[in-house]
Amino acid sequence: RRAYMVCGWGGAGAFSVGKLTLTTDYGGYLDDYMNKGELARLISYVDSVYCRFGGEGRQVYGDEHRDKIHELKRKAAAADLAFIPARIRHLGTDVNGEILTHMRDSFPSHVTVKANCPVDHILVKDGKVEGVIAGGETYLCKYLVAAPGRDGAEWFTKEAESLGLHTASNAVDIGVLVESPAEIYEPITDI
């Protein structure tokens, strides 16, 4: 049985604390495929979609105290470190789940979302997607969004290989919790 926390609508992100990192400075390799200006516009668009579906008015951190952030960057550089600030919209776990539900509920009637229906194969003819086979059923489509997430990564790698597609690994950003007395980090965390 698949792990509940990484499958389904929204995947693992559905149960996250709902923080949107609104920067081009880290978080993957999308800037390998487009320039930073275009990427920044897409990040802004995604933020606007989250706002339209329930995130409007949720706090964005990182715009205030620019002088203090500049000073932290200077101190980090003096220690041969990089302090990379980012704007973060904090939606919260409950609001994040509601937003994902509103998004799904907004799909037009001709869009079908199937859960608990693992895809066996992607159907391709003459270099164009035609559909998928899932659970012995054939589903035809003009466009396909294949987004298997971490849980389906192994299947997707094999499927891409069988279709002759080039794949590349992407780093996963992992947060690390370091517990120290509050006084040590207050100059950073209180900004």
Regions found by a protein language model. Give the residues of each.
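Residues forming the flavin
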Residues: 1-27, 67-191
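Dinucleotide-binding Rossmann-like beta1-alpha1 core, especially the glycine-rich loop
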Residues: 7-61
